[in-house]
Curated annotation (Swiss-Prot):
Protein name: RNA 3'-terminal phosphate cyclase
Enzyme nomenclature, EC number: 6.5.1.4
HAMAP family (UniProt xref): RTC
Matches recorded under NCBIfam families: PRK04204.1-2, PRK04204.1-3, RNA_3prim_cycl
Role noted for this protein: Catalyzes the conversion of 3'-phosphate to a 2',3'-cyclic phosphodiester at the end of RNA. The mechanism of action of the enzyme occurs in 3 steps: (A) adenylation of the enzyme by ATP; (B) transfer of adenylate to an RNA-N3'P to produce RNA-N3'PP5'A; (C) and attack of the adjacent 2'-hydroxyl on the 3'-phosphorus in the diester linkage to produce the cyclic end product. The biological role of this enzyme is unknown but it is likely to function in some aspects of cellular RNA processing.
Binding site for ATP: 103, 283-287
Enzyme class at the top of the EC tree: ligase
Gene from which this protein is expressed: rtcA
Domain of life of the organism encoding this protein: Bacteria
Keywords recorded for this protein, A-Z: ATP-binding, Cytoplasm, Ligase, Nucleotide-binding
InterPro entries documented for this protein: RNA3'-term_phos_cycl_insert, RNA3'_phos_cyclase_dom, RNA3'_phos_cyclase_dom_sf, RNA3'_term_phos_cyc, RNA3'_term_phos_cyc_type_1, RNA3'_term_phos_cycl-like_CS, RNA3'P_cycl/enolpyr_Trfase_a/b, RPTC_insert
Entry keyword Ligase: yes
Length: 338
């Protein structure tokens, strides 16, 4: 009988990432786990719709036995079965993040018995989660270098709090893993500013682009008007293409927050990234830990290890026979498999 892993959901950043990573790793390794204190560090602890959808999606994909899978639950037991490829569809039923549900189940499908397609409906532009364009333009090219081939398509936008978006990913089983080396980002090649609008006046986008252009020499400026029924919503993004990596930063517009303030938040975030020689931004770092651990080798540099990153590493080390090393030098932290 396989050993049961016991996790404390209050450890580290105390959010949903502990649960999502545990589900992914449990499906991959076949190790069951229990988790208590789910999202104990959040104002509204326990399973929200997005987390419950991730649990049910994971259970369906690997025929798991689950206890505690209900809204508000702070305890879960998950006994995985065999991962099977297929065509899967999951609905969150709110503006909860589609990409975070995908992030939970796709790693298991890298080891499935055949290709798969996963479609999730819910929120696509959520201030607390990476948008589909981040997955498509930043994460997936890096996964391809590791030997992981998946392709994400945004079928319909769904802004917070209304939702109604749809994201789909096609994924193939991995045949072999490669080592990812991201020590330096290299020189900047292009800066792209982009604004999405749905049911919001165009002058909002023009003011956001102007705020970005006042701080950066943009090589591209794009405004995309979406159908009104996909809104109301607004997201402003800035993509930094360097020689060795493309990073993408975004801010979701909010009611009663001016276009200038929204764009200024993005400017601050991008400047913080560019002020360090590190290759990887804070949010991308979280998402490289699992694929790098599965490959058994690799490294990247990040300006500062976030609590999210450290928590994710701790969970990965509970399930896999790997150890991460973090070394600070020359203004960056080098994260590697020891």
């Amino acid at each position: 009988m396989k050993r049961m892993i016991a996790l404390d959901g209050a450890q580290g950043e105390g959010g949903g990432q502990i649960l999502r990573s545990a589900l992914s790793l449990s499906m991959i390794t076949g190790l069951p786990f229990t988790i208590t204190g789910i999202r104990a560090g959040r104002a509204k602890p326990g399973l929200l719709r997005q987390h419950l959808t991730a649990v049910k999606a994971a259970a369906e994909i690997c025929r798991a036995t689950v206890e505690g899978a209900e809204l508000g639950s702070q305890r879960l037991l998950f006994r995985p079965g065999t991962v099977r490829g297929g065509d899967y569809r999951f609905a969150i039923g709110s503006a909860g993040s589609c990409t975070l549900v995908l992030q939970t189940v796709l790693p298991a499908l890298w080891f499935a018995d055949g290709p798969s397609r996963v479609e999730v409906s819910g929120g696509t532009d959520n201030p607390s989660a990476p948008p589909a364009d981040f997955i498509r333009r930043v994460l997936e090219p890096l996964l391809a270098k590791i030997g992981i081939h998946q392709q994400t398509t945004l079928l319909r936008h769904g802004f917070y709090p209304a939702g109604g978006g749809v994201v789909a990913t096609e994924v193939s089983p991995v045949t072999s893993f490669n080592t990812l080396q991201l020590g330096e980002r290299g020189n900047i090649v292009r800066l792209r500013g982009e604004v999405l609008l749905a049911g919001v006046p165009r002058h909002v986008a023009e003011r956001e682009i102007a705020t970005l252009a006042a701080s950066f020499s943009l090589h591209e400026q794009n405004i995309h008007n979406l159908p009104r029924d996909q809104g109301p919503g607004n997201t402003v993004s800035l993509e930094v293409e360097s020689e060795n990596i493309t990073e993408r930063f975004f801010v979701v517009g909010e009611k009663r927050v001016s276009a200038e303030v929204v764009a200024a938040q993005l400017v601050k975030e991008v400047k913080r990234y560019l002020a360090s020689p590190a290759a990887v931004g804070e949010y991308l770092a979280d998402q490289l830990v699992l694929p790098m651990a599965l490959a058994g080798a690799g490294e990247f540099t990040v300006a500062h290890p976030s609590c999210h990153l450290l928590t994710n590493i701790a969970v990965v080390e509970r399930f896999l026979p790997v150890r991460f090393g973090l070394v600070e030098a020359d203004g960056v932290t080098r994260v590697s498999i020891e």
